[in-house]
Structure formats: C-alpha cells, structure tokens
Amino acid sequence: MTDLVALEHIAVAFGRKAVLHDISFTLRHGHILTLLSPNGAGKSTLVWVVLSLIAPDARTIRRQPKLRVGYVPQKIHIDPTLPLTVERFMRLHPGVKKGDIGPALARVQAQHLHQAPMQKLSGGEMQWVLLARALLNSPQLLVLDEPTQGVDVNGQVALYDLIDNLRHTLGYGVLMVSHDLHLVMAKIDEMLCLNRHICCSGTPEVVSAHPDFIAMFGYRESSQLAIYRHHHNHRHDLQGEVMPAAQPHGECRHD
C-alpha cells in the first residue's frame, strides 16, 4: 500500500503554548484514517500540517511527490446576498472547466443541484457539493474536516457509504476529522484518539475500550460511541431517503 503522507514525531507550538507533541501516523493509498478528539485538542492544527498550511516546529514529513489533495472544510461562509449557484461556486476552483462540474456532482449523486443557489442548500447538500468540489482535481488524498457536521443520521450513513466507495473504486486515501462520538464509520482502517498527542489508536472497537479514550471523553460519553456498519441492500440519497430499486447499488460492499 503506497504511502501518501507520513508524519513522524511532529510537534507544534504557538509561542509558549504546545499544541501538538510527538505525532506520528501515515496516510496511505486506499486507506481511511479517522482522527477523533475533543474540541481544542489540536485537530485543526494537525489538519493544517497535513495540508502544508503551517510548518511544525519539530518534524519529519514525507509526501508522495506532486501529491494531489482534495479538502472538504468544516464549514464555509457565503454572503447571503451573493448570487452564487453550485455551478459558479465549483468553477471558482482553479483550472476547472464547465464540463468538469457535471461528472463531479454525478459522482456524489448531486447532479440535480447543478443550478441550485448555494445559500439554499441543506447541511447534507452542502457537504455533498463541497465533496464534489474536492474531487475536481482527481485527488490522491481526501481530507475531510468534520464532514458530518449539520448532517442527519441517514445523511451520515449515505456519506460513509460514498467515502467507502470512493476509496475502493478510485483508491483515494482518506483522513476524516471528527469530535462527534454519535456515529463512527466501522470500515475505517485506523482510528486515532488525539489530545495534543496520540492517546491511543486502532480499530473503532479497540479505541472505544481503551482507558485513555474513556478518560478523555468520560465513561458515559465514550460508551455511547456508535459504529456504523453497512448491512443494507439499498442506497440513500442526499436527504437520507431510500432510493428506488431501479437505481442499482452495484458499487455497494457488504460486511
């Protein structure tokens, strides 16, 4: 499995405040890694390091040459008075042609939003549009910062199905960042629990039972960690509704 980004013993401090200490992990082709941590534990800073937006104080970082990265931000603010359709928003991406937009939206089952006003999108629709935009440069690595924020449970299930499909069909490496314990994707390859340093790592089942994880989130909260497993034989749309049987779910993989 090809390494896309490898971090070894990363440390970041802002002034005298240590934000990250001794962080090591590897993002690989076809590999899904979830970073789970409470607010204020350094996860945004770590995302910036992965995206090369800040340089750590202590570092060994190896990247695949000419690595293409697609980024889905935690949120995006758009002036409500700005007349901006989904198509025009996606064309703001450098080098994008009009003909690139339809296929990107279709890949995430959002082609019907092509001419929709950005300001009128639901939380789930906005996430799908941001994901489609991240796919425009044919990335090798997807970085998703709180991708389920503002999305209901059915929408989260649909998003997890899509991410799993993308990594299998296109071989993307995926870094997902979250502070939400309510629903975690079971098919991730590795979960890291972060609180300025990596407290524990492993599968969701292993991490959820780790003493450091329980100490960080509390017994009550950590015991509520829900792991989503794909057991259905149908597909959800952007709103979480079951799609008609006439639309095949041939890309689906079952446990």
Curated annotation (Swiss-Prot):
<keyword id="KW-0997">Cell inner membrane</keyword>
<dbReference type="InterPro" id="IPR003593">
    <property type="entry name" value="AAA+_ATPase"/>
</dbReference>
<dbReference type="InterPro" id="IPR003439">
    <property type="entry name" value="ABC_transporter-like_ATP-bd"/>
</dbReference>
<comment type="function">
    <text>Part of the ABC transporter complex ZnuABC involved in zinc import. Responsible for energy coupling to the transport system.</text>
</comment>
<keyword id="KW-0862">Zinc</keyword>
<protein>
    <recommendedName>
        <fullName>Zinc import ATP-binding protein ZnuC</fullName>
        <ecNumber>7.2.2.20</ecNumber>
    </recommendedName>
</protein>
<dbReference type="GO" id="GO:0010043">
    <property type="term" value="P:response to zinc ion"/>
</dbReference>
<keyword id="KW-0547">Nucleotide-binding</keyword>
<dbReference type="Pfam" id="PF00005">
    <property type="entry name" value="ABC_tran"/>
</dbReference>
<dbReference type="GO" id="GO:0005886">
    <property type="term" value="C:plasma membrane"/>
</dbReference>
<keyword id="KW-0864">Zinc transport</keyword>
<comment type="subunit">
    <text>The complex is composed of two ATP-binding proteins (ZnuC), two transmembrane proteins (ZnuB) and a solute-binding protein (ZnuA).</text>
</comment>
<dbReference type="GO" id="GO:0015633">
    <property type="term" value="F:ABC-type zinc transporter activity"/>
</dbReference>
<dbReference type="InterPro" id="IPR027417">
    <property type="entry name" value="P-loop_NTPase"/>
</dbReference>
<keyword id="KW-0472">Membrane</keyword>
<dbReference type="GO" id="GO:0005524">
    <property type="term" value="F:ATP binding"/>
</dbReference>
<keyword id="KW-1278">Translocase</keyword>
<dbReference type="InterPro" id="IPR050153">
    <property type="entry name" value="Metal_Ion_Import_ABC"/>
</dbReference>
<keyword id="KW-0067">ATP-binding</keyword>
<feature type="domain" description="ABC transporter">
    <location>
        <begin position="5"/>
        <end position="220"/>
    </location>
</feature>
<keyword id="KW-1003">Cell membrane</keyword>
<dbReference type="GO" id="GO:0016887">
    <property type="term" value="F:ATP hydrolysis activity"/>
</dbReference>
<keyword id="KW-0813">Transport</keyword>
<comment type="similarity">
    <text>Belongs to the ABC transporter superfamily. Zinc importer (TC 3.A.1.15.5) family.</text>
</comment>
<keyword id="KW-0406">Ion transport</keyword>
